C-alpha cells in the first residue's frame, strides 16, 4: 500500500514513513519536513468509523483534562475513502515505554495517581457509541473467552486458565456486575504508557475503550505492571497508594482485584494461543505471552486473602482477620478423637492444585495430601461434578451410562484377569468388602496382614490394621488375624526380600499345621503407616506363588499407592511383577470426592453372587463415576504419572545429596511421588521421633505441608498432588536444609 497516496488529504508532507505493529489498523510513524512526528492509522473496515470517531472525541477531551500528554487527533477530521476505508492522524508522544524502564516504587505510585486522575476525569463522561461497544477485552465479557480455551494445547497450562475463569464466574462475576460503570481506557498495559524522568508522561492507544467498572482498569494496569516483578504484593501496594490519593476503592472492588488481574492474564494467553493457530498473526500478539504465563504461575502461589489485605489498609479498611472461633467451635461440636495436624492448627479457606490458602493469608505448598491426586479444585472435576449433579444422581439399581463407561476405563488399566469391579464410598469400605468377599470365596476366616499396615477405619479395617491394633490403646491382633513381618530393607530383620518371604511362608506353614487356613493376605505395595516403606524387592515375587498354591487370595491395597503415584507403574503391585486376586482402591480415585472400589476376578465376583444382594447406596452413583472418569482423563492428558516419575527422581537425587551432609537423614525412600525421609539420631541411630515432629512443624512455619509416620513416627512423609513440580521440590529442600542447619537433634 502506498501510504503517501492515502495521506494526500492531510496537510503533511512525509519525509519518513516507518511501519508499526498493530492488529486492528495499519499503523505508521510519519516524520514531516519540519521534523514533527505523527502516528497515521488506516482502517479498512468501514463499520469501525463511528467508534473510532468516538475514540477521537474521548482523546481530545482527555487532552484538556489530564496533567500528562494524551495521544490525540493531530487533524480535526478523519478522512474516509470511496471504498469505505478511512484514516486518522494522531499526535506522536515522546518517551520510553513503561515496559522498557527500570521499575521503582515511586514510578508505580505515580502510575496510580495518573490512573486515579484518569478515572476522575471520566467519571461523568458519556458517549453512547462507547457504551454500546462490546468486545472481548472488556472484563465484563471475560467468560466469552471460555469458548477459545481449547486453543491452549498444553493441558497443564489450560487448567490454570480454566481455574481462574471458574473462580471469576463463581465468586466475582455477580459482584462486578453490580458496580457502577464509566468509560475506561481498558488497556493500560506497559506498551501504552510512556515514561520520562521516572514519571508517567503519556498514555496512548485508546483502541479498547469500554464502559465498565473502574476496578477493571486497575486490574489491567496491574496485570501488566506485575510482569517480571519479584514481589507482586509490594508493586500492587505502591500503585494502590498512589491511586488512593485521589480515588477510593470500595471493599467489593478490592475483593475483586485478585481474580480480575488473573482473568486479564487469562484472556491475553488465550488470545495468543488462538492467534498461534493462524499464520497471519502479528508478533505483537505474542509480546507478553511468556511473562503472562509466568505471572499466572506465580499468582497461584499468592493467597487471595493476603492480596486483599495488602490493599485494605490503603483505603482505610481493616485487614481481614482469621476466624478465631473456628477452633473453639470444633471442640464444642466434634470429638477430640478427630486429630489436627500441627501443634498450631491451620484454618484453610481455599486451594488450587498443589497450593492451599489459609485464613491468615499464608499460602501453603501441599507436599502431603495425596487425596487431591490431580490437584486441589481442578476445574475439569468441578465442571463435570456440577454438570452431572444438574442431570442425574441415582444408584446402581438403575441403568446409566456413567457407570459402565467408567468401569470400562478403569478395568482397562488392569490385566484381563481382573475384570469385575464393586463400587463403594471409600478405601476403608473397599478393604472391608475385600475381606468379606475373600472369606466368602474361600470359606475361610483367618487373615494375613503386614506389621504396621493400615487398611481403613471400619471395624474390619481396624481388625486387619497392625498400625491400629499394635498402636496406642491397641489390644493386639484379633485371633483370626496374623501379622507378618514388614519386609523392609532399612533397619530390617532379614537380608533380602526373598528371606522375608521365606520367613512369612514359615509362619503360614505353622498356622497350617495348627489347622488354620488363611483366606487372604492383604498388604500395600508401599507401607504408608509403616514409614513409606516399599516392600523389599523379591518379597512378593517369592511369596505370591506360595499363596496361590495354598489358595490364599492376595489383596493389593492400592488406596495410597495406585493411579500412577509411583511413576514407573500405574499400580504399585506392578513394580514387583505380581498379579493380585483383588485390588482395593480409594483416596485418589475421586480426587477428594468419596469413592472407593474393589477390582477382582470373574470367578470371585460370581461366587459373591449368592442371593445375599450387595448394594451400596451411594457407591457407583453417576456423579462419582463422572468424577472418577475425569480423574483418569486428567492423569493421562496432563502426563501426571510421568511427572510423578520425573519429579520423584529429582527429589530422590536432592534428598540423597542432603543425606550425605546431614546424617540425621537415615534413609531416603522414593517411588515416584510416594516419598519418605527417615530421621534418626546420628549417634545412636535410634528413631528421632521428637526431632521429626519439630521438623514437620518448622516446615509448616515455612508454609510447607508434610507429616510424619511410621511405628516410631519419625519418618517425614510426602505424598503431594501429582502436579507437584521440580520447582516445588526446590522450595521444599531450600526450607528443609535451612531447618536442618538450625535445628540440632
Language-model regions, residue ranges each:
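An alpha-helical support segment within catalytic cores of ATP-dependent transferases
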Residues: 2-7, 126-127, 143-186, 325-331
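ATP-binding glycine-rich phosphate-binding loop
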Residues: 10-28
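Active-site acidic catalytic loop and adjacent metal/ATP-binding pocket
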Residues: 24-32, 39-40, 169-216
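A conserved alpha-helical element in kinase catalytic cores
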Residues: 42-83, 101-102, 106-109
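A cross-family kinase active-site recognition segment
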Residues: 101-156, 179-181, 445-474
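Active-site activation/catalytic loop segments of kinase-like enzymes and analogous catalytic loops
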Residues: 215-248, 262-280
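ATP/Mg2+ or Mg2+-diphosphate-binding catalytic cores
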Residues: 268-326
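Conserved N-terminal phosphate-binding loop of PLP-dependent enzymes in the Aspartate aminotransferase
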Residues: 315-745
Amino acid at each position: 500500500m502506498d501510504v503517501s497516496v492515502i495521506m494526500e488529504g492531510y496537510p503533511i508532507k512525509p519525509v519518513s514513513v516507518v511501519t508499526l505493529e498493530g492488529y486492528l489498523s495499519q499503523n505508521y510513524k510519519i516524520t514531516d519536513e519540519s521534523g514533527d512526528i505523527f502516528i497515521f492509522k488506516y482502517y479498512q473496515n468501514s463499520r469501525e468509523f463511528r467508534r473510532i470517531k468516538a475514540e477521537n472525541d474521548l482523546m481530545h477531551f482527555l487532552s484538556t483534562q489530564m496533567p500528562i500528554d494524551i495521544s490525540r487527533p493531530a487533524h480535526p477530521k478523519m478522512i474516509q475513502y470511496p471504498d469505505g476505508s478511512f484514516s486518522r492522524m494522531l499526535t506522536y508522544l515522546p518517551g520510553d515505554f513503561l515496559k522498557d524502564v527500570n521499575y521503582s516504587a515511586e514510578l508505580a505510585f505515580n502510575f496510580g495517581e495518573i490512573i486515579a486522575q484518569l478515572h476522575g476525569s471520566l467519571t461523568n463522561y458519556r458517549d453512547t457509541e462507547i457504551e454500546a461497544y462490546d468486545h472481548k477485552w472488556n472484563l465484563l465479557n471475560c467468560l466469552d473467552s471460555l469458548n477459545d480455551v481449547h486453543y491452549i494445547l498444553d493441558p497443564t497450562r489450560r487448567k490454570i486458565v480454566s481455574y481462574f475463569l471458574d473462580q471469576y464466574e463463581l465468586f466475582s462475576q455477580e459482584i462486578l456486575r453490580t458496580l457502577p460503570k464509566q468509560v475506561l481506557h481498558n488497556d493500560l498495559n506497559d506498551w501504552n504508557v510512556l515514561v520520562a524522568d521516572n514519571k508517567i508522561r503519556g498514555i496512548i492507544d485508546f483502541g479498547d475503550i469500554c464502559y465498565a467498572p473502574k476496578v477493571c482498569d486497575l486490574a489491567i494496569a496491574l496485570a501488566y505492571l506485575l510482569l517480571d516483578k519479584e514481589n507482586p504484593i509490594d508493586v500492587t501496594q505502591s500503585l494502590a497508594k498512589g491511586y488512593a490519593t485521589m480515588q477510593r476503592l470500595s471493599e467489593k472492588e478490592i475483593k475483586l482485584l485478585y481474580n480480575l488481574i488473573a482473568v486479564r492474564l487469562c484472556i491475553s494467553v488465550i488470545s495468543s494461543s488462538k492467534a498461534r493457530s493462524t499464520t497471519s498473526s502479528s508478533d505483537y500478539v505474542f509480546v507478553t505471552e511468556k511473562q503472562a504465563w509466568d505471572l499466572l504461575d506465580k499468582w497461584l502461589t499468592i493467597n487471595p486473602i493476603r492480596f486483599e489485605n495488602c490493599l485494605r489498609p490503603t483505603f482505610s479498611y481493616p485487614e481481614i482477620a482469621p476466624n478465631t472461633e473456628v477452633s473453639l467451635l470444633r471442640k464444642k461440636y466434634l470429638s477430640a478423637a478427630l486429630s489436627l495436624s500441627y501443634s498450631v492448627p491451620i484454618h484453610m479457606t481455599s486451594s488450587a492444585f498443589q497450593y492451599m490458602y489459609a485464613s491468615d493469608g499464608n499460602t501453603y505448598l501441599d507436599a502431603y495430601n495425596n487425596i487431591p491426586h490431580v490437584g486441589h479444585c481442578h476445574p475439569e472435576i468441578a465442571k463435570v461434578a456440577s454438570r452431572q449433579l444438574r442431570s442425574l444422581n441415582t444408584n446402581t439399581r438403575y441403568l446409566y451410562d456413567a457407570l459402565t463407561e467408567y468401569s470400562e476405563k478403569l478395568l482397562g488399566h488392569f490385566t484381563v484377569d481382573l475384570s469385575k469391579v464393586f463400587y463403594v464410598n471409600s478405601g476403608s469400605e473397599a478393604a472391608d468388602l475385600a475381606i468379606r468377599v475373600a472369606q466368602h470365596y474361600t470359606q475361610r476366616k483367618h487373615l494375613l496382614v503386614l506389621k504396621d499396615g493400615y487398611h481403613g477405619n471400619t471395624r474390619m479395617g481396624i481388625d486387619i490394621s497392625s498400625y491400629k491394633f499394635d498402636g496406642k490403646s491397641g489390644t493386639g491382633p484379633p485371633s483370626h488375624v496374623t501379622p507378618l513381618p514388614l519386609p523392609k530393607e532399612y533397619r530390617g530383620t532379614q537380608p533380602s526380600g526373598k528371606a522375608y518371604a521365606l520367613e512369612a511362608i514359615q509362619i503360614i506353614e505353622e498356622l497350617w499345621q495348627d489347622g488354620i487356613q488363611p483366606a487372604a493376605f492383604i498388604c500395600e505395595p508401599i507401607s504408608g503407616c509403616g514409614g513409606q516403606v516399599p516392600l523389599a524387592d523379591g518379597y512378593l515375587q517369592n511369596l505370591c506363588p506360595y499363596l496361590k498354591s495354598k489358595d490364599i487370595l492376595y489383596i493389593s491395597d492400592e488406596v495410597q499407592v495406585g493411579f500412577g503415584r509411583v511413576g514407573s507403574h500405574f499400580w504399585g503391585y506392578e513394580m514387583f511383577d505380581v498379579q493380585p486376586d483383588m485390588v482395593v482402591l480409594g483416596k485418589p480415585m475421586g480426587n477428594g470426592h468419596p469413592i472407593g472400589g474393589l477390582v477382582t476376578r470373574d470367578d470371585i465376583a460370581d461366587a459373591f453372587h449368592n442371593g445375599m444382594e450387595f448394594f451400596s447406596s451411594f457407591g457407583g452413583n453417576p456423579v462419582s463415576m463422572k468424577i472418577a472418569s475425569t480423574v483418569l482423563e486428567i492423569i493421562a492428558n496432563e502426563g501426571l504419572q510421568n511427572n510423578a516419575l520425573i519429579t520423584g527422581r529429582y527429589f530422590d537425587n536432592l534428598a540423597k545429596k542432603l543425606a550425605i551432609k546431614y546424617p540425621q537423614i537415615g534413609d531416603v525412600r522414593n517411588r515416584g511421588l510416594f516419598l519418605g525421609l527417615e530421621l534418626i539420631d546420628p549417634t545412636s541411630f535410634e528413631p528421632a521421633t521428637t526431632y521429626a515432629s519439630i521438623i514437620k512443624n518448622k516446615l509448616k512455619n515455612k508454609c510447607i505441608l508434610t507429616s510424619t509416620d511410621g511405628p516410631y513416627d519419625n519418618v517425614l512423609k510426602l505424598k503431594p498432588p501429582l502436579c507437584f513440580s521440580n520447582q516445588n521440590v526446590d522450595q521444599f529442600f531450600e526450607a528443609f536444609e535451612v531447618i536442618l542447619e538450625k535445628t540440632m537433634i
